[in-house]
């Protein structure tokens, strides 16, 4: 037509298999065979309790009619070109993964399974999302050419069936929740005194609770803080729901200019593993030393809890909680290039990893705290033609 240069509507649907055999989830090889240990369990008897009798123990029951993990895939897309300038590509995808091999956690031990809960193709997971790319290019004059491009991706997933046991609290279930989510305790600030500790639910999380430690919410109201009080504190995890990019190239006479930005959103960063609040006893980072709770700084709103000589003395503060949860969204000024063409070549200036804009300020939001940082680089060069 006068305005539409090209229009294509695409669609596909198929059933594919996956060779994932459950090894990553703890399954063993040769699942079609019962596995029995002859010296794994027993009892001790005798006058002096010095005689032990061992008996057989089934460690893995054979999987009957086990099969491949399967995926039903649907993709609907459109390719559109308008005004000989604008190109749009959009896709919607939906994947229903089933027959996932997992432990039958819903089977009670009273049926005689003990530690050998059977494996079965019961798991189900859904994935869906959209992808969009747009490119606009226009030659205004013989001296001026502009090219804009952008891309956007949004994805979601959730557990549909995990054959979970019957939990005493509904918030412990994973069914219906995202795969990449953040689970932990709900923090309620820092303890300011021993009196406050004595009048609060008991916290037995690996170390003796002292003033300056993190206080957690007793979600189930049983007077103690334990694994039953862990909830989904964010529907997002380290894998972002949204990823995007935006770039531009401009040519004017002998000059050329280009930039590109990329970023992600709906992403959570947990910083509870940073030193000295991780599993290793390293030096204190400067931003922690600047604002942590201490007897000389008994600020209940300090950014970081009290310190200890070893990580075992502060185990209460190292568990995952909202205290350590941060917004991991960011926009990165990825590349910049400016060039000038002359008769025998081109001279240029470019840069990579120019800047990062994010509410998270401690380190590069794309990296972990102990990773080597991305380098910011600038180059000046000359390209010669002979």
Which residues does each predicted region cover?
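Conserved active-site-proximal loop/helix segments of enzymes involved in bacterial cell-wall
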Residues: 103-106, 225-227, 275-277
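Gram-negative outer-membrane beta-barrel transporters
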Residues: 120-240, 251, 262-267, 273
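Extracellular/periplasmic, surface-exposed regions of secreted and cell-surface proteins
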Residues: 1-180, 320-386
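Flexible glycine-rich, low-complexity coil/linker segments exposed to the extracellular/periplasmic environment
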Residues: 35-61, 175-237, 286-322
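Extracytoplasmic gating/loop element in the C-terminal half of outer-membrane beta-barrel translocons
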Residues: 211, 264-345, 351
């Amino acid at each position: 037509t006068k305005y539409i240069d090209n229009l294509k509507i695409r669609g596909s649907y198929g059933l594919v298999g996956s060779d994932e055999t459950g090894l990553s989830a703890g399954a063993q090889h040769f699942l079609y065979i019962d596995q029995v240990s002859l010296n794994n369990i027993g009892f001790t008897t005798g006058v002096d309790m010095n005689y032990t009798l061992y008996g057989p123990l089934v460690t893995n029951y054979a999987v009957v009619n086990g099969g491949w993990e399967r995926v039903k895939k649907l993709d609907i897309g459109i390719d559109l070109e308008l005004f000989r300038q604008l190109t749009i590509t959009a896709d919607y995808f939906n994947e229903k993964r089933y027959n996932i091999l997992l432990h039958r956690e819903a089977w009670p031990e009273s049926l005689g399974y003990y530690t050998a809960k059977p494996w079965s193709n019961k798991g189900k997971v859904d994935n869906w999302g959209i992808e969009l790319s747009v490119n606009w290019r226009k030659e205004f004059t013989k001296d001026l050419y502009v090219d804009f491009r952008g891309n956007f991706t949004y994805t979601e997933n959730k557990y549909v069936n995990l054959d979970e046991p019957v939990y005493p609290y509904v918030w412990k279930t994973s069914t219906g929740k995202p795969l990449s989510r953040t689970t932990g305790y709900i923090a309620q600030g820092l303890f300011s005194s021993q009196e406050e500790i004595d009048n609060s639910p008991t916290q037995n999380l690996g170390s003796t609770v002292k003033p300056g430690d993190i206080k957690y919410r007793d979600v189930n109201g049983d007077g103690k803080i334990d694994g039953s009080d862990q909830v989904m504190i964010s529907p997002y995890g380290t894998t972002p729901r949204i990823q995007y990019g935006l770039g531009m190239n401009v040519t004017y006479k002998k000059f050329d200019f280009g930039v590109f930005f990329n970023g992600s959103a709906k992403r959570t960063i947990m910083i509870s593993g940073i030193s000295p609040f991780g599993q290793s006893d390293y030096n204190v980072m400067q931003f922690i030393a600047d604002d942590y709770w201490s007897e000389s700084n008994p600020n209940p709103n300090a950014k970081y809890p009290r310190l200890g000589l070893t990580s075992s003395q502060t185990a209460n503060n190292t568990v995952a909680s909202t205290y350590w949860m941060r917004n991991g969204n960011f926009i990165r000024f990825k590349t910049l290039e400016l060039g000038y063409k002359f008769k025998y070549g081109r001279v240029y200036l470019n840069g990579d990893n120019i800047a990062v804009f994010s509410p998270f300020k401690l380190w590069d939001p794309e990296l972990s705290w102990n990773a080597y940082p991305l380098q910011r680089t600038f180059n000046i060069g000359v390209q010669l033609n002979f």
